[in-house]
From Swiss-Prot:
Region ranges (Disordered): 1-49, 149-210, 263-293
Tissue/organ expression: Maternal expression is an anterior cap concentrated in the cortical cytoplasm. Its transcript is produced maternally and sequestered near the anterior pole of the mature oocyte. After egg deposition, it is translated into protein, which diffuses toward the posterior, forming a long-range anterior gradient.
GO BP annotations listed: anterior region determination; anterior/posterior axis specification; anterior/posterior axis specification, embryo; maternal determination of anterior/posterior axis, embryo; negative regulation of translation; oogenesis; positive regulation of transcription by RNA polymerase II; regulation of DNA-templated transcription
InterPro entries: HD (IPR001356), Homeobox_CS (IPR017970), Homeodomain-like_sf (IPR009057)
Entry coiled-coil feature ranges: none
Protein name as annotated: Homeotic protein bicoid
Family named by the database record: Belongs to the paired homeobox family. Bicoid subfamily.
GO MF: DNA-binding transcription factor activity; DNA-binding transcription factor activity, RNA polymerase II-specific; mRNA 3'-UTR binding; RNA polymerase II cis-regulatory region sequence-specific DNA binding; sequence-specific DNA binding; translation repressor activity
Effect of residue 438 to P: In strain: Z184, Z210 and Z216
CDD domains: homeodomain (cd00086)
Length: 494
């Protein structure tokens, strides 16, 4: 069996010679020395392990391994006799030398602290100057600054946590003596400057910006601050509109009246508040609700730059005609108001339930029997509108369902009517015809008394064709106006 070469790195020195000795060796001698070899006790090994390199050399790692022969070795191996002069020097021992800790004097620490207050990080010129001045190495100075920055960060975090836990801090509160001087410069200097690390307490009075843009929390803020924001709001309104008018020349007398009415409400509440603080809580809540409603009403009335007018659902709006164009609103007379009320009730029967954005015509069943004596509209072929609805049992195609929509103007010409068209015709017959429909083109000439329903001729069809188109557009636009806000409205004619 071929023997591999002995490992030359075993114990950092070459292995001893392997020629035959006068005395038998069971393993190579661990140390090479000039004096005669010391004999070790004979090991009882199996005959196949007589050659020591058959066991000690590991072919996988290329190094000597004792694990193969360990079961055959005695528990107590005799130590070879090694003289002290033959021990390995310290340079051959793979051990990291322990670095001695640097002890700084009090004068050095004071000088380092002074430089740390000037700047937490060292530049190359400062490092060279400071190390030469203190007779220290540059590595020692850099390590001291690194540890000092870490300690400063920990102290800053602890101080910040204490400030948040005990918020708000009293003006006379001083920091502990253990804090670094850099943090003491940020503390309250006799109550003259606010603490930079502590958030300021809640302000006593809100600004006009908060009062204008945070109107949702207006009531809760009033309860907390005891009504001081009313005086601030009054001052804001006086500065914005000193003459009592609106934001521009287009403001109406209604807006001016509401402005003065709101000022009177504010002044009245201020007098009640300053007369005594023992007002019952229930009366105070009622005043707050009334004031909040007035505030919201005034705020929405003044915003005229928006393209679509914002409507508050709970407020009565009797001063405007909603069935006319929203570009040409005008005041209504008594007869016109009654007709408009009927038409508005037919267009949106539930004001709080928004209807989908689908155009309604005279054959729509949702308008049947809603108004005062409003029967269902009858189509041209004497077919009721309820028959046009798909209840799931009939198998109508889309073209069959949309067929009544194509004959919309024809059905209007034949005299089929509902409450919406009646209200619009009554409105168009008054003197407000030009104001109501000036946007959509030239209005039809004034008509005489209309013939009974179902008896219309060619002349009546020509005069009512324009009106039927307007009815359909307004019926589709009313639910969109109530629900859509500032979004655009589009109507497609078939």
């Amino acid at each position: 069996m071929a023997q591999p070469p002995p490992d030359q790195n075993f114990y950092h020195h070459p292995l001893p010679h392997t020629h035959t000795h006068p005395h038998p060796h069971s393993h190579p001698h661990p140390h090479s020395h000039p004096h005669p070899h010391h004999q070790h006790p004979q090991l009882q090994l199996p005959p196949q392990f007589r050659n020591p390199f058959d066991l000690l050399f590991d072919e996988r790692t290329g190094a000597i391994n004792y694990n193969y022969i360990r079961p055959y070795l005695p528990n107590q191996m005799p130590k070879p006799d090694v003289f002290p002069s033959e021990e390995l020097p310290d340079s051959l021992v793979m051990r990291r030398p322990r670095r001695t800790r640097t002890t700084f004097t009090s004068s050095q620490i004071a000088e380092l602290e002074q430089h740390f207050l000037q700047g937490r990080y060292l530049t190359a010129p400062r490092l060279a100057d400071l190390s030469a001045k203190l007779a220290l190495g540059t590595a020692q100075v850099k390590i001291w600054f690194k540890n000092r920055r870490r300690r400063h960060k920990i102290q800053s975090d602890q101080h910040k946590d204490q400030s948040y836990e005990g918020m708000p801090l009293s003006p006379g509160m001083k920091q502990s003596d253990g804090d670094p001087p850099s943090l003491q410069t940020l503390s309250l200097g006799g109550g003259a400057t606010p603490n930079a690390l502590t958030p300021s307490p809640t302000p006593s009075t809100p600004t006009a910006h908060m009062t204008e843009h945070y109107s949702e929390s207006f009531n809760a803020y009033y309860n907390y601050n005891g009504g001081h924001n009313h005086a601030q709001a009054n001052r804001h309104m006086h500065m914005q509109y000193p003459s009592g008018g609106g934001p521009g020349p287009g403001s109406t007398n209604v807006n001016g009246g509401q402005f003065f009415q709101q000022q009177q409400v504010h002044n009245h509440q201020q007098q009640l508040h300053h007369q005594g603080n023992h007002v019952p809580h229930q009366m105070q809540q009622q005043q707050q609700q009334a004031q909040q409603q007035q505030y919201h009403h005034f705020d929405f009335q003044q915003k005229q730059a928006s393209a679509c007018r914002v409507l508050v659902k709970d407020e009565p709006e009797a001063d405007y005609n909603f069935n006319s164009s929203y570009y040409m609103r005008s005041g209504m007379s008594g007869a016109t108001a009654s007709a408009s009320a009927v038409a508005r009730g037919a267009a949106s029967p539930g004001s709080e339930v928004y209807e989908p954005l689908t155009p309604k015509n005279d054959e729509s069943p949702s308008l049947c029997g809603i108004g005062i004596g409003g029967p269902c509209a009858i189509a041209v072929g004497e077919t009721e509108a309820a028959d046009d609805m798909d209840d799931g049992t009939s198998k109508k195609t889309t073209l069959q369902i949309l067929e009544p929509l194509k004959g919309l103007d024809k059905s209007c010409d034949d005299g089929s009517s509902d409450d919406m068209s009646t209200g619009i015709r009554a409105l168009a017959g008054t003197g407000n015809r030009g104001a109501a429909f000036a946007k959509f083109g030239k209005p039809s000439p004034p008509q005489g008394p209309q013939p009974p329903l179902g008896m219309g001729g060619v002349a009546m069809g020509e005069s009512n064709q324009y009106q039927c188109t307007m009815d359909t557009i307004m019926q589709a636009y009313n639910p969109h106006r109530n629900a859509a806000g500032n979004s655009q409205f589009a109507y497609c004619f078939n």
